[in-house]
């Protein structure tokens, strides 16, 4: 599960650090100024933000995430996955990753996947084209698709990154193939 919203990049911060409390107080003030009906964010287990937000009166749930800090040993990374995630990866052994999906094909695939779920897309085609043009110019985006032996797209994801992190920005999967392990392979 990706981490959405606010997270602290300084790994040296702990929940009893006064800087965390200050950051969270400022964040809570900004939320108040927005006049939102509610605010929802997932925090990774062990995040120093959790206790600080609880102290400010927020209901907070921690969630196990697959925020991968070090990719130097992929075997170790996979060993840390849950049994369910490993089982999904086993199912995906006959599938392959493709990096040749174009932005237009990705958009159409995402629209189709959402339509199957009786949902509508939350961004315009034009927005995605501008985002893609800018991130491609910087060399900071990639579309991954998972295909079967018949070259059908089962799942896809639009990834962007900066010098610190990669973001699994827009994932989508075809409901017909939800049990194929394709979405696990994207991670």
Residue ranges and their predicted role:
Residues 43-179:
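A conserved beta-strand-loop-helix scaffold within acyl/acetyltransferase catalytic domains
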Residues 1-58, 163-187:
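Acyl-donor binding region in acyl/amide transferases
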